[in-house]
């Protein structure tokens, strides 16, 4: 699961449903009055606790018995990580440090990487989160970049609620109830350079379903439109459609669940992704979240119980289940979608350009590699990962097996990196250096040429690495270390830690 600041999209008024899943909904108790929210940790924790008490009663309304209230517990700590509250349906309880165990202390040391951490604490499944003003500032910057507006502090609170319900759904409904191991999905990588056509087809299907939600009287018409585009996608891009299926199910259902639980308690919270440019320019797995609208429509159509069985058995994605009885049109006039296609293309042109601060380092790294001027310090991280989080994966079409990780924050046993873009190859992470002068090497020796783990790279030297200079974006934890050295057919240089 990718860890990104929650997309804050245009609001949609929640439509009450008359389907059978609603008829047996529990009576929701009177909602507590919300306290004032401020940046102060105590005030913020009090607000979150009241919000959780508002949201929890809706858990069973939007999913079946697999979603147990007792498995949705929040551990909230402050920026100094010296205060901790357990928050759930029972209220808010401070946990004194005398009760902190090894699992919790490990979580506290790692929570800043992804913003959350799962653990079992005092026989409860818990989601640990940190009230970090640095993360709040990052969220504000992203929204200002996307929408040009400053989000209210409540939206930071909503983000924490969304993390609690969405991510706990992965861990304590999907994984715990033997769905699929959601954390092991390997199909989320966006190919680079980006082929616009499959992205456009899926986004057109999303736009059709959004219109079906907004205008129920025209739902049948929009279902046909969505069926055409999703079938064209699945026919022309068979391999990609098969590989993204699991993520469509896993993220689509978790997004549906998390947004509904919060929106039911807070109607100003956006139920669905909007259709703004930044939502039309995302990567392949962004679409998996957006297509959660299909689960909303399944529920509105009264078929959620049946769909749950299909999702659990990984038989159908939300959009395929929704449209399984819809006939694809034989003669569809694609020109009617020309305006939407142009809008999507323009949004993607902006997204995948050097003007995007998250895309610029990817473009620069690939250009440097293509030129043969790259210098990599390479670390094997197999069985050494402490934590990792990234804001995007790009599989490099021109270099099969290589993946570009955007804004990676990671801790390995041998290296720590702080928000940089790197390459990965199997269990190896490749840190790009400005030049070789950053490496202090001793005992440089020629060796008999030998094969390396990397394609078209042969080792011909070895040395002892004693220091890495002027690199603020990552640091080596273990020095000195032995390295072997080689080049690829383009001239790029690889210093591989042994």
Feature names for model-found ranges:
Residues 7-35:
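Bacterial Sec-dependent N-terminal signal peptides
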Residues 43, 47, 310-498:
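Non-catalytic terminal regions of proteins
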Residues 93-157, 468, 488:
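Active-site scaffold of zinc-dependent metalloenzymes
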Residues 162-175:
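Active-site recognition of the HExxH zinc-binding catalytic motif
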Residues 238-334:
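Active-site-proximal alpha-helical
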């Amino acid at each position: 699961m990718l860890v990104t600041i929650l997309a804050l999209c245009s609001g949609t008024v929640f439509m009450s449903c008359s389907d059978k899943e609603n008829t047996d909904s529990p009576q929701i108790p009177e909602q507590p009055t919300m306290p004032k929210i401020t940046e102060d940790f105590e005030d913020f924790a009090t607000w979150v606790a009241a919000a959780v008490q508002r949201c929890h009663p809706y858990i069973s309304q939007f999913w079946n018995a697999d979603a147990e209230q007792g498995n949705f517990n929040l551990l909230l700590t402050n920026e100094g990580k010296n205060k901790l509250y357990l928050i759930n349906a029972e209220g808010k309880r401070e946990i004194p440090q005398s009760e902190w165990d090894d699992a919790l202390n490990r979580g506290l040391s790692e929570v800043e990487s992804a913003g959350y951490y799962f653990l079992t604490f005092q026989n409860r499944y818990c989601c640990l989160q940190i009230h970090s003003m640095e993360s709040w500032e990052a969220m504000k910057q992203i929204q200002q970049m996307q929408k040009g507006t400053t989000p209210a502090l409540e939206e930071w609170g909503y983000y924490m609620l969304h993390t609690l319900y969405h991510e706990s759904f992965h861990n304590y409904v999907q994984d715990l109830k033997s769905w699929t191991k959601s954390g092991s999905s390997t199909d989320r990588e966006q190919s680079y350079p980006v082929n616009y056509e499959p992205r456009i087809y899926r986004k057109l299907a999303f736009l059709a379903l959004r219109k079906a939600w907004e205008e129920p009287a025209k739902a049948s018409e929009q279902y046909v439109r969505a069926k055409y585009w999703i079938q064209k996608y699945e026919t022309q891009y068979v391999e990609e459609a098969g590989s993204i299926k699991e993520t469509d199910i896993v993220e689509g259902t978790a997004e549906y669940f998390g947004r509904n639980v919060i929106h039911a308690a807070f109607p100003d919270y956006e139920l669905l992704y909007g259709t703004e440019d930044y939502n039309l320019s995302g990567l392949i797995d962004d679409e998996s979240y957006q297509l959660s609208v299909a689960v909303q429509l399944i529920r509105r159509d009264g078929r959620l119980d049946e769909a749950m069985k299909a999702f659990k058995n990984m038989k159908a994605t939300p959009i395929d289940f929704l449209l399984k009885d819809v006939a694809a049109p034989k003669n569809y006039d694609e020109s009617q979608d020309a305006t939407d296609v142009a809008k999507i293309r323009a949004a993607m042109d902006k997204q995948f350009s050097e003007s995007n601060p998250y895309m610029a380092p990817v473009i620069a790294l690939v250009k440097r590699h293509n030129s043969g001027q790259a210098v990599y310090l390479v670390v094997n991280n197999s069985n050494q990962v402490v934590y990792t989080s990234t804001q995007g994966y790009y599989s490099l079409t021109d270099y099969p097996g290589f993946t570009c990780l955007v804004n990676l924050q990671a801790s390995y046993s041998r290296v720590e990196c702080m928000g940089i873009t790197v390459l990965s190859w199997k269990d190896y992470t490749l840190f790009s250096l400005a030049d070789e002068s950053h490496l202090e090497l001793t005992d440089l020796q020629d060796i008999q040429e030998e094969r390396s783990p990397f394609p078209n790279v042969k080792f011909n030297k070895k040395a002892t690495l004693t220091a890495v200079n002027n690199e603020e974006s990552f640091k080596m934890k273990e020095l000195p270390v032995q390295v072997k050295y080689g080049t690829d057919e383009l001239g790029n240089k690889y210093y591989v830690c042994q």
